[in-house]
Structure formats: structure tokens, C-alpha cells
């Protein structure tokens, strides 16, 4: 496999943005990663996800589950590259579930696929559903791991890249102090 610079591909795809952002957590940042911009470019997405597929070669799993929305395309492409089934979980009445005829069988070894892992919240919601159905989560695969050091998951993370993006409380945000307007790029509804 050739040496793939994931950060460069994210920048070329306008997926790694710089500016002033209000994150779904309510914190502010000067950088934001919007992997949907990468995923609209199939050839670039294929290259980046090949980095994850390479890391999964030694992992024993038989199915991939991506939470909607961000994990759906990642699940598909990772499934294509690893020759494993790829399905997705979605919310119904606010609760994550497996539907549309998809199933997790007792004993299935599952990789959860995501675009970006920040807090791990959606991955952990999906893991709960998988485990309730009798599956075993053996890892989380993602394009970007941007967890802070204090954010832990119970599962190994297989990422194409690790990004450390600083975040700030509104009161400590230098960009706010400079009156630079923010944008809300997140995928979760602001509360």
C-alpha cells in the first residue's frame, strides 16, 4: 500500500476547515472536520478508508455497522474493501436501532464504522443495540479520531488519522473576544 497522507486528502476535499465554529457540544473551535465533504468524492474516500481496511486485516470480525448518518457511507466502503457485509443503524423516535431487515446474529463480531469519533456517543449507542441483539463489538473504525485524552471507549479504535482539535468554552474563546462570527457546522441538533 502506498503512503497515503490522510490530512492532505481531507484538506483537498475541504473536509478539514479552519475558522470559528460552534460545535454540537456547545464548545468553540478554530478547526472543524466535516467528513461528508470527503465522502462526496468516491476516489478520495476509497483511498482514506483503505488506511482503515489495512488496520483491520488482523481483526476478527464478520460484519460492519455504521450509525446514520456519518457511518453509513463509511460502512459501505469499508465493507466493499474488506469483503464483509456492511449495514447501518438509525434512529427511530430518537432511539438508535437496527431495522430495514438488517440483523445482528448471536455471536456476530462487529466493527462499528464512523466518519468522526469525538465523544463516542453514537458509537456507544450502537454498541448497546448490537450487544442487546447478541453481537460482540470488537472495535470502532473511523476516518478521524478526534477524541480528547479524557474520552475513553471500551473498544479499540482503528482510525485513518488522529486529529487534536482544541476546543474552548465560549467565555475562553479568543475568536469570540475578537468578535469573529462563528458557524454551526455540526450534524447534531443544537440544544
Swiss-Prot record:
InterPro entries: OPRT (IPR023031), Orotate_PRibTrfase_bac (IPR006273), PRibTrfase_dom (IPR000836), PRTase-like (IPR029057). Disulfide bonds: none annotated. Gene3D superfamilies: 3.40.50.2020. Orotate binds at residues 118, 146. The keyword Transferase applies. Its EC number is 2.4.2.10. Keywords: Glycosyltransferase, Magnesium, Pyrimidine biosynthesis, Transferase. It is an enzyme of class 2 (transferase). Its cofactor is Mg(2+). Homodimer. This is Orotate phosphoribosyltransferase.
Amino acid at each position: 500500500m502506498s503512503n497515503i497522507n490522510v490530512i492532505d486528502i481531507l484538506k483537498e476535499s475541504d473536509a478539514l476547515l479552519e475558522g470559528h465554529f460552534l460545535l454540537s457540544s456547545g464548545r468553540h473551535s478554530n478547526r472543524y472536520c466535516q467528513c461528508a465533504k470527503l465522502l462526496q468524492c468516491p476516489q478520495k474516500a476509497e483511498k482514506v478508508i483503505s488506511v482503515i481496511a489495512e488496520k483491520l486485516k488482523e481483526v476478527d470480525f464478520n460484519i460492519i455497522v455504521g450509525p446514520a448518518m456519518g457511518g453509513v457511507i463509511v460502512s459501505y466502503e469499508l465493507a466493499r474493501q474488506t469483503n464483509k457485509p456492511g449495514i447501518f443503524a438509525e434512529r427511530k423516535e430518537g432511539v438508535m436501532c437496527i431495522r430495514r431487515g438488517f440483523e445482528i446474529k448471536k455471536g456476530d463480531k462487529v466493527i462499528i464504522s464512523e466518519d468522526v469519533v469525538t465523544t463516542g456517543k453514537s458509537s456507544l449507542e450502537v454498541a448497546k443495540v448490537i450487544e442487546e441483539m447478541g453481537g460482540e463489538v470488537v472495535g470502532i473504525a473511523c476516518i478521524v479520531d478526534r477524541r480528547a485524552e479524557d474520552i475513553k471507549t471500551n473498544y479499540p479504535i482503528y482510525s485513518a488519522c488522529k486529529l487534536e482539535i482544541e476546543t474552548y468554552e465560549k467565555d475562553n474563546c479568543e475568536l469570540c473576544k475578537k468578535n469573529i462570527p462563528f458557524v454551526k457546522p455540526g450534524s447534531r441538533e443544537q440544544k
